[in-house]
UniProtKB/Swiss-Prot annotation:
Its main location: cytoplasm. Belongs to the TACO1 family. One of its GO terms (cellular component) is cytosol. Coiled coil: none annotated. This is Probable transcriptional regulatory protein Haur_3030. It comes from Herpetosiphon aurantiacus (strain ATCC 23779 / DSM 785 / 114-95).
């Protein structure tokens, strides 16, 4: 397990994902708004919007909140428009970090992100400074149950034109070309598999390791970044061992 998937697992173990429903809803609503702005307000015609709405419903977000987010994206509500912005920089030890944000005020967002980097041993770089180190991919997470046959799921994913399949204890992670995410996700869904996540991810072309102290510094930086309201996702090329991930998560 690596990249954003490992980071998400660390956050889950720390209980952060359960503690901050309001913040999660804010980020999901921004996903919905951006998707509606880019592809229109119909989930039947807009795959990204459909995924965002499914994520919102899975997190028990009220229907009114979902509709308000759609209305903001399509311009019905009259609220300030959101735009997607990507920031790039380096964490401690030269680890590459990419930050996806959704904002209605670039100056506020870049100031908050720069402060997070500076206070946690990192440096905010220029656009393109580390982006070349990553590939944009589709990520599908399938929940494992007692009845799940990893070999069968792997074959189904490959038949659906997936790039790679990683089998973990509680989930099976499927990577796809980003352009094929919708098709692969729908093909797996038709097989009755329980898909918990289908989203864009940034997959590092080359991963880097760091000692324990540096690893924890980088994870703290990523945590501070992801806690910012405008930040949607944080990626890095840091490889974290299961042992260090567990140790960091236990810090609370």
């Amino acid at each position: 397990m690596s990249g954003h998937t490992k980071w998400h697992e660390i956050r889950r173990k720390k209980g952060v994902l359960d503690q901050r429903r309001g913040q999660r809803w804010t980020k999901i609503a921004r996903d919905i708004t951006i998707a509606a702005r880019e592809g229109g307000g119909s989930p039947d015609m807009n795959f990204r919007l459909r995924l965002a709405i499914e994520k919102a419903k899975a997190d028990n977000m009220p229907a009114d909140n979902i509709q308000r987010a759609i209305d903001r994206g399509t311009g019905v509500s009259g609220e300030a428009a959101l735009e997607e912005v990507t920031y790039e920089g380096y964490g401690p030890g030269g680890i590459a970090v990419i930050v996806d944000a959704a904002t209605d005020n670039r100056n506020r967002t870049v100031s908050e992100i720069r402060t997070a980097f500076n206070k946690n041993g990192g440096t905010l770089g220029e656009g393109g400074s580390v982006g070349w180190m990553f590939d944009i991919k589709g990520l599908i997470s399938i929940d494992r149950t007692e009845k799940t046959d990893p070999d069968e799921v792997t074959l189904l994913a490959i038949d659906a034109d997936a790039d790679d399949v990683i089998v973990n204890d509680d989930a099976i992670i499927v990577y796809t070309e980003f352009s094929k995410l919708a098709a692969v996700r729908d093909a797996l869904n038709e097989q009755g598999l329980k898909i918990s996540t289908a989203e864009k991810t940034m997959l590092a072309k080359t991963i880097m390791e760091a000692d324990e102290a540096t690893t924890f510094q980088i994870l703290r930086l990523m945590e501070r970044l992801e806690d910012l309201d405008d930040v949607q996702k944080v990626y890095s090329n840091l490889e974290v061992s299961d042992e260090l991930a567990e140790k960091y998560a236990e810090q609370g």
